[in-house]
């Protein structure tokens, strides 16, 4: 009998009823919510006279709509209504939350792990497509729609069809100047944004083993850009050490770890598809187009037009085949988002700007992903490094990742961004987004254009 993957083991643990190949009813261990996808779900509960079945397994935070300057000055009517409504709903339904402006508030996919609520073995959902981030801990985690949010509120369960399994093995040692963001951007560039459709993606290999938990979260975060709702990794000592001592960690921690150690893929586990990437051959990545697969290694020319999507992307981005990343005239730099706004990301970026100043006519902002990260960074003096270099140092939130709050890239301006999506108008109407690592974004801020971080003294 073939061995089981970590996903198989967790699926079996949470299966309540249902036949294979059909929707199956799954138990949910942790439900994260934010202000955008929860209001209608709460209203549905009220209309039906229902309560939240397990408020103790539900946690809310404010992230998408919150301003990162003057955080209480919310001028957009819809944004203010959503924030006010979540404040009302968590109070009415008795749900623990990181209140707007509180010392815990931040992006949901950062606050969850920081509180210790994200743990190996859990089945986690949230009304947000980047919920796969939590899979880095050895959890099943994926985004759901608002009607499903209401279903989880009412029943603590969700109907799901078990996906196929894909194994992506990252092997080898990356060159200096190549980071986990480059791993996932390279994967998407090689195989496309639909390669993971219908699959859960398990990321493994010695290159994954050597990453920190924060670096692992970056990879799982962008599973959805690879086409998969779910990304997962096997937990190890780094995982246990990250969770230990946090408020939400299990009280009997040693017993929990003993259980978690059984939740790893068997050596003979079977997968429907296997991809292997040698990271020693990778280079810093930069996207040129309007989906994350439209990316190249630094120094490579942008590809020839292959179809209408390429033609439209080039027209929107005001670029052309044969150009290179270093040819792009940047106007904005954004270091933040649930992909790359953790403390280690800010530390990395700060190395490239310390003692320097951003290029003229450039706007650069740093948005820590949570209040704890901001406080920790300030204790280390990172805020001063960034501000002395001409960056704006902001309060936590989703910020410029998406145009749902005051932080937007102006029409027609090119932005080097550490976020996860480069769709048309994603960062504001007419914004031209180039996805990259925090190192590439920080170095670009100083030079005014993309440069090869592998050649800079900061990586030597």
UniProtKB/Swiss-Prot annotation:
InterPro entries: 3-IsopropMal_deHydase_lsu, Acnase/IPM_dHydase_lsu_aba_1/3, Acoase/IPM_deHydtase_lsu_aba, Aconitase_4Fe-4S_BS, Aconitase_4Fe-4S_dom, IPM_dehydratase_rel_enz, IPMI_cat. It catalyses: (2R,3S)-3-isopropylmalate = (2S)-2-isopropylmalate. Gene3D superfamilies: Aconitase, domain 3. The keyword Amino-acid biosynthesis applies. Keywords: 4Fe-4S, Amino-acid biosynthesis, Branched-chain amino acid biosynthesis, Iron, Iron-sulfur, Leucine biosynthesis, Lyase, Metal-binding. Transmembrane segments: none annotated. PROSITE patterns: ACONITASE_1, ACONITASE_2. Its cofactor is [4Fe-4S] cluster. [4Fe-4S] cluster binds at residues 338, 398, 401. Pathway: Amino-acid biosynthesis; L-leucine biosynthesis; L-leucine from 3-methyl-2-oxobutanoate: step 2/4. It is an enzyme of class 4 (lyase). Heterodimer of LeuC and LeuD. This is 3-isopropylmalate dehydratase large subunit. It comes from Streptococcus sanguinis (strain SK36).
């Amino acid at each position: 009998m073939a061995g089981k993957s970590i996903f198989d083991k967790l699926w079996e643990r949470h299966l309540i009823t249902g036949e294979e190949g059909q929707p199956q009813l799954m138990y949910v261990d942790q439900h994260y919510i934010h202000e955008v996808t929860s209001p209608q779900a709460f209203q549905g509960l009220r209309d039906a006279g229902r309560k939240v079945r397990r408020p103790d397994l539900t946690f809310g935070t404010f992230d998408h709509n919150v301003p990162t300057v003057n955080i209480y000055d919310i001028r957009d009517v819809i944004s203010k209504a959503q924030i006010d409504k979540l404040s009302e709903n968590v109070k009415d339904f008795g749900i623990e939350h990181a209140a707007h402006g509180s010392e815990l508030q931040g992006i949901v996919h950062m606050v969850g792990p920081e509180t210790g609520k994200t743990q190996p073995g859990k089945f986690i959902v949230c009304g947000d497509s980047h919920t796969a981030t939590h899979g880095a801990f050895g959890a099943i985690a994926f985004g759901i729609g608002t009607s499903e949010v209401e279903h989880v509120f009412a029943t603590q369960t969700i109907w799901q069809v078990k996906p196929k399994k894909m194994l992506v093995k990252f092997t080898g040692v990356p060159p200096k100047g190549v980071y986990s963001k480059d791993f996932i951007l390279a994967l998407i560039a090689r195989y496309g944004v639909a390669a993971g459709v219908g699959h859960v993606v398990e990321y493994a290999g010695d290159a994954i083993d050597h990453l920190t938990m924060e670096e692992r979260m970056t990879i799982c975060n962008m599973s959805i850009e690879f086409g998969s709702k779910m990304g997962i990794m096997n937990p190890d000592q780094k995982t246990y050490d990250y969770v230990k001592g946090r408020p939400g960690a299990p009280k009997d921690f040693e017993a929990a770890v003993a259980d978690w150690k059984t939740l790893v893929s068997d050596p003979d586990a079977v997968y429907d598809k296997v991809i292997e990437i040698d990271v020693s051959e990778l280079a810093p990545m930069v996207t040129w187009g309007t989906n994350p697969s439209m990316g190249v290694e630094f120094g490579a020319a942008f590809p020839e037009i292959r179809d209408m999507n390429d033609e439209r992307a080039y027209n929107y981005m005001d670029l052309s085949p044969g150009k290179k990343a270093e040819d792009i005239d940047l106007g904005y730099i954004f270091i933040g988002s649930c992909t790359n706004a953790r403390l280690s990301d800010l530390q990395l970026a700060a190395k490239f700007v310390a003692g320097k100043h951003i290029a003229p006519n450039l706007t650069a902002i740093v948005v820590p992903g949570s209040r704890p990260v901001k406080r920790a960074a300030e204790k280390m003096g990172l805020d001063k490094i960034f501000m002395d270099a001409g960056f704006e140092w902001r309060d936590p939130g989703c910020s410029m990742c998406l145009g749902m709050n005051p932080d937007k890239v102006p029409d027609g301006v090119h932005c080097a961004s550490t976020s996860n999506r480069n769709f048309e108008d994603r960062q504001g109407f007419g914004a031209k987004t180039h996805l990259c690592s925090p190192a590439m974004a920080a170095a670009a801020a100083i030079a005014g254009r993309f440069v090869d971080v592998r050649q800079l003294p900061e990586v030597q």
